[in-house]
Amino acid sequence: MTLQRLYRLGEELVANANSRDPFQIADEIGLQIQMVKDFTVLKGVYMILHEVPWAFINDNLDDRMKRIVCAHEIGHHLLHQDLVRQ
């Protein structure tokens, strides 16, 4: 995927959610978010459980990093679901 295509995808997500907040975007695209307090090293994990997409985010991170990790997990959801389903 080209950088231009990634940029367009991001702009489409923002327009559809009417927000740049990755948590609102996740809600708009059906990605469930769960904060996890007992992650020690991991910042976030994306997985599909019973056909429902989930992003688990380390609750010990500061708010800025939580937003970054959420956006990263949205990328997994939109671009790499095929790898998770294997």
Predicted feature descriptions by range:
Residues 1-86:
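Active-site hotspot residues in diverse enzymes, especially metal/ion-binding acidic/histidine motifs
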